[in-house]
């Protein structure tokens, strides 16, 4: 299990008063993976096959297996720290498709920015959001995984909002 020291190092957004518990969990779980890839594999990925809501949708996924292979050899990278501007961008874009019922990265009223963006739909916990992005099931580019684990990124903004079709929309914007 995670030590209190590991949780403390990973939980870089814990003192941001306006973030929800789920948003703080997103930052913490990405950081646990970045800081402690082999432990993350052991504690979070090896026995993760999906969610209660969607069943064991990744149990036999080659994408899950490729994440296992990566984490076995990945060197730790620095934690991400909360950034207000990235949060504002993420929040705007979590609300916009949530109301419209859309998915993807096309903005209508939210401004484009110079950041790496990950969008997750339908997940209820920070852990499930992060594992959806890291496993990147059926995303051949593995773009979400690459963004989340890229050592060039140092800052993150996360917003989780309601989505009319998928219940939730989480947007994570990372910058350097």
What are these regions (language model features)?
Residues 14-112, 145, 151:
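Short, well-ordered surface patches within globular domains
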